[in-house]
Regions:
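Conserved adenine-nucleotide phosphate-binding loops and their immediately adjacent elements
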Residues: 1-19, 84-88, 184
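Winged-helix-like regulatory helical subdomains adjacent to P-loop NTPase cores
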Residues: 4, 11, 201, 221-255
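Alpha-helical sensor/transducer elements of the RecA-like P-loop NTPase core
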Residues: 10-13, 40-42, 72, 130-218, ...
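Phosphate-binding P-loop
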Residues: 18-27
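P-loop NTPase Walker A phosphate-binding motif
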Residues: 28-58, 154-156
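A short hydrophobic beta-strand->loop->alpha-helix junction that borders the nucleotide-binding pocket
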Residues: 55-65, 90-93
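Conserved NTP-binding/hydrolysis module of P-loop NTPases
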Residues: 67-87, 103-105
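Conserved Walker B catalytic segment
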Residues: 99-151
Length: 255
């Protein structure tokens, strides 16, 4: 799990996720823009179920395919006493999504579990997408204590929200900015922060944790606009195509 320097707020979001997970077998999709705190929330969610469920945290990488993920799952299942999935991988050069999902859910029968997948937007492997789609449907109506939680920058419905009969297969819980009280605690570098100034900053940042941290870093020199511009340039603008940059330039002129 990633190390957290600090953590403020998010109690409402965490309570909501925990209640849904405890209520029944479920799949949750938690989308949010870059820097909004998805990995932090994922870490805290796992902490809530520590010593209560078998836990798997997997952070996706750009280069990753389904095979490497399946091998991680096989090792995890073997550690909790079930080698069925590992045997399947050893005998199957090209695992099938439906089979992999069924074996995974079957292996967790009678085993309270929480599977947290972080940075799912990085996954381009169709087999892995189809496996999670099949797993979300397999969990539908299950009486087992199994939960699958996907954290992603993408707001696209990567898992089905309903099955063919209209039953809810997954829930989408978008992650927004911090509330006013939690966000203000991130501005530790400000010696004095008037309410009016804080309201302006919170309105500007919309409670975005990373934006608030960048503002905090520039507080002593009064240069937080520069840190924000650097972040936008490196993390967003530099990754756009030429056509996307032209569209943004046009919008900036004619807004």
């Amino acid at each position: 799990l990633p190390r957290l320097r600090h953590f403020y707020g998010r109690e409402k979001e965490l309570d909501n996720m925990a209640n849904l997970i405890e209520a029944r077998a479920t799949t949750l999709l938690v989308p949010g823009i870059a820097g909004i705190g998805k990995t932090t929330v994922a870490s805290k969610l796992i902490e809530r179920f520590m010593h209560r469920r078998n836990l798997l945290y997997h952070r996706c990488q750009d280069w990753e395919g389904s095979r490497s993920f399946f091998e991680s799952v096989a090792d995890w299942l073997a550690n909790i006493g079930d080698s069925t999935f590992a045997d399947y991988l050893a005998a199957t050069p090209v695992p099938q999504p439906a089979d992999a999902a069924r074996l995974l859910v079957d292996a967790l029968e009678g085993t309270p579990s929480l599977i947290v997948i972080d940075d799912f937007h990085k996954v381009a492997d169709a087999t892995l997408h189809q496996t999670f789609q099949a797993m979300s449907l397999a969990l539908l109506g299950s009486e087992e204590e199994i939960a699958l939680v996907l954290f992603s920058r993408s707001f696209k419905p990567v898992v089905p929200t309903k099955d063919a009969e209209g039953r809810i297969a997954s829930l989408v819980l978008p992650l927004d900015g911090l509330d006013s009280d939690a966000g203000r605690k991130l501005l530790s570098s400000f010696d004095e922060l008037a309410d009016e100034q804080w309201l302006h900053i919170h309105g500007l940042s919309r409670g975005h944790p990373l934006v608030l941290e960048l503002i905090n870093r520039g507080a002593s020199a009064g240069a937080f606009h520069e840190t924000l511009e650097n972040y936008v340039t490196v993390e967003i603008f530099s990754k756009l195509s030429a056509e996307q940059k032209r569209v943004l330039s046009a919008l900036a002129i004619y807004r």
